[in-house]
A protein has these predicted regions:
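Conserved glycine(s) of the Walker
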Residues: 15
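Hydrophobic anchor at the beta1->P-loop junction of P-loop NTPases
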Residues: 8
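Conserved substrate/cofactor phosphate-moiety recognition/catalytic segment
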Residues: 18-71
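Small-molecule kinase domains that catalyze NTP-dependent phosphoryl transfer to phosphate-bearing small molecules
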Residues: 123-169, 173-180
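P-loop (Walker A) phosphate-binding loop of NTP-binding proteins
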Residues: 11
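Conserved phosphate-donor/acceptor-positioning beta-strand/loop module used by diverse small-molecule
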Residues: 101-121, 153
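Glycine-rich phosphate-binding loop used to anchor ATP phosphates in small-molecule kinases
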Residues: 57-101, 105
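Walker A (P-loop) ATP-phosphate-binding motif of ABC ATPase nucleotide-binding domains
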Residues: 5
Length: 180
């Protein structure tokens, strides 16, 4: 039995990591929480922050690694919650890999309003991105998703637990399904 791929995305501060952790931890099946930031932070020499000009080639490589890791887990029977900033331009590699491997793929965009996003980001600790201009730019990247606009969840008024519940329901109902 193969697993399912769930790409859980949105701008920094949207709650992706917290929600992905809840979805993966409370799952009824074998489930992996794939933190895509790890694939970027593994680059020790020549790293370019992925939102800066000049990062496109690096980002293409990192997305290929993400897709490979996610599909390998799923082929092994694990559901995979891919937690990261996965814009529209990186949906095709996930879609192609899912189609080729016969996997189910859902694309879920957490998109709180900008004020909520910036507020949540200010409250985050650690070495998370704090540049309001960069966060605003990444928020704008998810502002108009064209044919995938129906894959957006406005989480402005939801806490992490409520958002995780909504994600589970939506994925179960196939609302955000792209493949399968």
């Amino acid at each position: 039995m193969t697993g399912e791929l769930i790409v859980l995305t949105g701008p920094p501060g949207a709650g992706k990591s917290t929600v992905a952790e809840l979805v993966a931890t409370d799952a009824e099946r074998l489930t992996v929480h794939l933190l895509t930031d790890q694939f970027y932070t593994a680059i020790r020499t020549g790293f370019v922050p992925p939102y800066l000009p000049g990062s496109a080639d690096q980002n293409d490589v990192v997305v290929d690694v993400m897709v490979g890791a996610a599909t390998t887990y799923a082929r092994g029977g694990y559901d995979v919650v891919v937690d990261g900033v996965v814009g529209l331009h990186y949906v095709p590699p996930f879609r192609a890999a899912a189609e080729q491997a016969g996997l189910v793929l859902s694309y879920v965009v957490l998109r709180p309003d900008l004020e909520t996003t910036l507020g949540r980001d200010r409250d985050r600790g650690g070495d998370s991105l704090k540049d309001a201009g960069a966060i605003t730019g990444l928020h704008e990247m998810f502002a108009d998703l064209g044919e995938l606009e129906s894959h957006v969840m406005d989480t402005s008024g939801l806490d992490a637990a409520a958002t995780a519940d909504e994600v589970r329901r939506a994925v179960s109902s196939q609302r955000f399904r792209l493949v399968g």
